[in-house]
Amino acid sequence: MDIVLEVCDTFLFDPLYATLLPAQASSFTANATANATLSSIRQEPTAYALPHASWQYEPATKYFSIEPSKYAYMSSWPRDDWRRQALTLYLITWLFGVCVYYLFAGLSYLLVFDKATFNHPRYLKHQIKLEMKQANIAFPIMAIFTVPWFLAEVRGYSKLYDTTEKGPGRWYDYLQIPFFIAFTDLCIYWIHRGLHHPMVYKHIHKPHHKWIMPTPFASHAFHPIDGYAQGLPYYIFPFLFPLSKIASVAFFVFVNIWTVLIHDGEYAHNSPIINGAACHTMHHLYFNYNYGQFTTLWDRLGGSYRKPNDELFKRELKMCQDEWNKQAKAVDMMVEQVEGENDRSYQGEPESKKVQ
């Protein structure tokens, strides 16, 4: 995350902090400026205009560097102050998450999502607005819990490495990808399954299961603790195992995009291995199946795998009324079993039922 922090500092936060918290010139600088000749100031103006910096610039990666502008030295809050880093990382985590969410969920909605889903008997009234509202509530709160992990990374407490020479070797540069997927898939399976425990579900995980027929905007529409809990394996991994800095940033983006993809309702492949949109739709419809994030491995081993209905892969069948009615009947039974009272308000139903 130090790479992202460096880029954001250079182009956004250095000027912002320099404006809001300008540095006070030291007495040494003030005296030097007073004794300087006009010609010397003209020759080297920055020597007298900029306060003394308490930090030294070191590129976050050897693959590229961004020379700091003058603003990097003009704030009383230097780049290496942990409080500034924490605040900046909070804003990055929050705002970057929002941008990725709206960009990719929006693209998926426009280009991929089948709008016929709006006619499903278990599609909620004003569902997309409700999904966006829940996501907007979750992002800033999740960022609070996430910042300590990113701050620890930036301050050198993790096993993140920059170049191959700094890591275990070239072999690990390739192995870290399936290793990361396998580790996080295992952990998320058990975390997700734990969120379905009756003592936890109604308080934490139920908001995400409000969406029986999710749209791409349901991807991040969950309780903040729910989202943070399922993100923990990603944050923990670089403190347990080596991970390249570039891979860390790439995984951060990929995971957010993947979360959108498994909620887009486009059943592109009927894979027995990949836990794609079809498998995750089964989870939203039938609750207690397909807890995995990337693969079906742990669901198969844990006895919670449910093969997606064949009808999902045939458009003329997946959108037919008979299939929808069958799904609605099964959903109602599961809702009664898992939640008891159903407080959802479905499209086409009278206003007597309100989604809370």
Curated annotation (Swiss-Prot):
A motif (Histidine box-3) lies at residues 280-284. It is found in: Endoplasmic reticulum membrane. One of its GO terms (cellular component) is endoplasmic reticulum membrane. GO terms for molecular function: delta7-sterol 5(6)-desaturase activity; iron ion binding. It is a multi-pass membrane protein. It is an enzyme of class 1 (oxidoreductase). Its EC number is 1.14.19.20. It catalyses: a Delta(7)-sterol + 2 Fe(II)-[cytochrome b5] + O2 + 2 H(+) = a Delta(5),Delta(7)-sterol + 2 Fe(III)-[cytochrome b5] + 2 H2O. InterPro entries: Fatty_acid_hydroxylase, Sterol_Desaturase_Related. The chain crosses the membrane at residues 87-107, 134-154, 171-191, 235-255. Residues 179-303 form the Fatty acid hydroxylase domain. Its main location: endoplasmic reticulum. A motif (Histidine box-1) lies at residues 192-196. Keywords: Endoplasmic reticulum, Iron, Lipid biosynthesis, Lipid metabolism, Membrane, Oxidoreductase, Steroid biosynthesis, Steroid metabolism, Sterol biosynthesis, Sterol metabolism, Transmembrane, Transmembrane helix. A motif (Histidine box-2) lies at residues 205-209. Its cofactor is Fe cation. Pfam families: FA_hydroxylase (PF04116). Coiled coil: none annotated. Pathway: Steroid metabolism; ergosterol biosynthesis; ergosterol from zymosterol: step 3/5. GO terms for biological process: sterol biosynthetic process. May contribute to the regulation of ergosterol biosynthesis. The histidine box domains may contain the active site and/or be involved in metal ion binding. Belongs to the sterol desaturase family. PANTHER family: STEROL DESATURASE. This is Delta(7)-sterol 5(6)-desaturase. It comes from Leptosphaeria maculans. The lineage of its organism: Eukaryota, Fungi, Dikarya, Ascomycota, Pezizomycotina.
